[in-house]
Amino acid sequence: MDPSASITIDDSLWPLLQVRFPSAFTNSQQEQYLSRLLTYLRRGERYVGILDTHLLKNTTSEQRQRQADFIKEHEALFRSCSLGTAGIITSPLMALGARILIHLKPMPSPYYVASSLPAAVTWAAERLELAGLFGPAERVRRHFGLLAERRTG
């Protein structure tokens, strides 16, 4: 594993929070990510997340358990702040596994398994609009080139 690879968090399009995972990460990197995520949750602001896991090869059982424990521990914050999360999962087998897990143990907020970044962004923008956040939804679409061009003439 490349020790310089890390989980990156981008809030430049807030209330869209983008998280990109490397092919592998350490437990320490996961704790740093969860600590930052908790900071966002404690703001009490509504947001939508995109988790880009297309590079991620696998996680350890310890990391999966830590993630589940974190979600359970902060379930009330997720319910009040998260408008939903789109997870980009490009492996059909991993996507199926994610859907089964979500079915067996539903997330505290809506979750969408996307096969690409445009699909995730489209879903995230729709979640923002459903919450009445039309300006941020348009800004997100514009940033990713997903706005239809207006015709004049």
What are these regions (language model features)?
Residues 2-153:
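Amphipathic, Lys/Arg-enriched alpha-helical "gate/interface" segment within cytosolic domains
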